[in-house]
């Protein structure tokens, strides 16, 4: 198997060109190559495949072999891979994923290689049942946001627009995890995220994400498991974030998670 290892913001995957030949047992391969001691070492496996609906299809697997719907950093690397390896000469590339078709804008440097990629990540999904979050598994679903935005529509026009036609959103709702109460906000960017805000007076590098992360990931409130972002708001333009990805554990970065975190921070 020929492969290329690439990273976006430290979010690293093993990439395989499957445009001509398929890869057998990709879930099993993902587990083997992702092992950082006995394999190549990565957050997962990404296959670049043909598509009937777009230029390419991105098929991704987490480190535990489970299939994911979307990866923001991963799809940026797909854009660089297909251009730099001559699979396309387009600088606007459409890539199909399980979360829909994403449009990539490639910035080509003077050396003829892709220097950066901008991705249209699409509209965030806030409807609880579509994130999905089971509101019945929360401490007590209050939906207090409804009165907040109804009583003061000028509070945040972006939030008001995002919540249009949303019946039940999970915004700053309490959840009991390993005996402790946390407030979460649920957002889907094609894959499920819950955002948790931490106190600024704590050292986020010492937060025990290895212990807490799996409890969130496998909580009964999240029927498809969950990616969890633990966030500190340093100021109105700066966030500090650590992420626990379902199926992969803590990763250096998460593109969809960063988008979900910004959405959640606006909502809050």
Protein language model features and the residues they cover:
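ATP-dependent small-molecule kinase catalytic core of the GHMP/sugar-kinase superfamily
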Residues: 98-197
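A glycine-rich beta-to-alpha transition motif near the start of alpha/beta enzyme domains, typified by
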Residues: 1-113, 156-157, 194-268
């Amino acid at each position: 198997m020929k492969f290329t290892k690439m990273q976006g913001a430290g979010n690293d995957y093993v990439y395989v060109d499957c445009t001509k030949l398929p890869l057998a047992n990709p879930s099993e391969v993902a587990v083997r190559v992702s092992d950082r001691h006995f394999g190549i070492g990565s957050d997962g496996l990404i296959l670049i495949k043909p598509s009937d609906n777009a230029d390419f299809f991105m098929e991704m697997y987490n480190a535990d072999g489970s299939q994911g719907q979307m990866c923001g950093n991963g799809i940026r690397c797909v854009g660089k891979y297909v251009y730099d390896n001559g699979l396309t000469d387009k600088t606007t590339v459409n890539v199909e994923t399980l979360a829909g078709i994403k449009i990539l804008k490639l910035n080509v440097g003077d050396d003829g290689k892709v220097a950066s990629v901008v991705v249209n990540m699409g509209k965030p999904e806030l409807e609880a049942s579509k994130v999905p979050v089971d509101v019945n598994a929360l401490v007590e679903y209050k939906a207090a946001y409804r009165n907040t935005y109804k009583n003061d529509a000028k509070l945040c026009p972006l939030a008001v627009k995002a919540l249009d036609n949303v019946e039940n959103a999970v915004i700053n709702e309490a959840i009991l995890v390993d005996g402790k109460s946390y407030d979460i906000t649920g957002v889907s960017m094609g894959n499920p995220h819950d955002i948790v805000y931490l106190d600024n007076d704590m050292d986020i590098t010492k937060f025990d994400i290895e212990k807490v992360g799996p409890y969130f990931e496998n909580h009964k409130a999240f029927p498809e498991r969950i990616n969890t972002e633990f966030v500190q708001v340093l100021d109105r333009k700066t966030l500090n974030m650590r992420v626990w990805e379902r199926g992969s554990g803590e990763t250096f970065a998460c593109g969809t998670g960063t988008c979900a975190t910004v959405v959640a921070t606006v909502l809050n």
